[in-house]
Amino acid sequence: MNELALKYGCNPNQKPSRVFMNEGELPFEVLCGRPGYINLLDAFNSWQLVQELRRATGLPAAASFKHVSPAGAAVGVPMSETLKKIYFVDDIKEPLSPIATAYARARGADRMSSFGDFIALSDTCDLPTALLIKREVSDGIIAPDYTPEALEILKAKRKGTYCVIKMSTDYRPKPIERKQVFGITFEQGRNEIDLADDALFANIPTENKNFSEEAKRDLKIALITLKYTQSNSVCYVKDGQAIGIGAGQQSRIHCTRLAGQKADLWWLRQCPKVMALPFKDDIRRADRDNTIDIYMGDEYEDVLAEGAWQNFFTEKPEPLTREEKKAWLAQNQKVALGSDAFFPFGDNIERAHKSGVEFIAQAGGSVRDDHVIATCDKYGIAMAFTGVRLFHH
């Protein structure tokens, strides 16, 4: 089959819609459901991301995509009991497989953004992974294969309409890619730059030149994630997973702030006071996510006011004070930060430092590089100039 008709394009009024190959057969098979235009944009971008993470780290990888940018990306590094709890997988008694662990991390980092996501897996979707996916609100999944038990579970999701795509691992696109805008065809070479090479970290202009192996791994995860994120973009990574992605912002500092805010919320969810929130047993996962998000923010009274807290909790929690948040956030450390282009000013470093960043990889080449370097030196941050820009549109 070299063509697949779609219900509509980006919006219901954009008809007809299809995906097709000018030469050869489509490199994927729809095993269940009917994918939409945006579903497939998410699927094919996320597929590239997880395959590249797999090659760069040697670990199974997963991504959670929404509107053609990742909400989360991770590799299969074992999780702490704390992470299992905040990702709502602590009730799973059997050990999670590496690919299930990667998925739990990718989905769990920014659960608010991942609601209704499209999932990508680098490896075969097994039963533990399918059981995790079964409990989440998601639009679909792309993977190289599925075990029979996993496929049975996924085909039953959303009353049999859940989108399940099997992607060929042999497929290699041509080196030239094209797209049309306003009837005009754009053509460019594919972005096939290798981000797995340690040579990326050869140019280190900061006083601190020490990058641990874990830091290099996390910086590679950040850069590969950014390669498939709408620009401008910045990505915070810790312990083998993205913890804050700032996508599609017009200014670099707003990327850094947005991603930093997400990273802070990820860390705050691990605060004992947040983890001990006395939720009612019948609160749905999505409502729990939303309530936690509000509780950690400035509008906490929306869930703690009299007449409101009773809807979510068995007893009224105490607010998480500004001082408590500041003290907890100060404990975050060893965070890696990647940027899809150079940092023009040191304000980005100031903001990154507040979220525990100790390692940075960015293109370099700003007229204010000296100021950026000096700000890193102020905090003992190790920074590499990669010389690589990673814009994606």
Stretches found by the model and what they are:
Residues 1-197, 215-233:
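Active-site loops and adjacent core secondary-structure elements that bind or stabilize anionic groups
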Residues 22-34, 109-115, 188-207, 286-308, ...:
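Gly-rich Lys/Arg/Thr-decorated short loops/hinges at beta-loop-alpha junctions or inter-strand turns
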Residues 52, 228, 265-269, 354, ...:
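Conserved helix-loop functional segments at active or binding sites
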Residues 56-64, 164-167, 231-238, 268-279, ...:
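Flexible, glycine/charged-enriched surface loops at secondary-structure junctions
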Residues 69, 125, 238-241, 249, ...:
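Active-site-proximal loop/turn and secondary-structure-junction residues that shape catalytic pockets
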Residues 117, 121-122, 135-165, 170-172, ...:
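C-terminal binding/interaction regions
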Residues 213, 217, 221, 227, ...:
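C-terminal accessory/binding modules appended to enzymatic or scaffolding proteins
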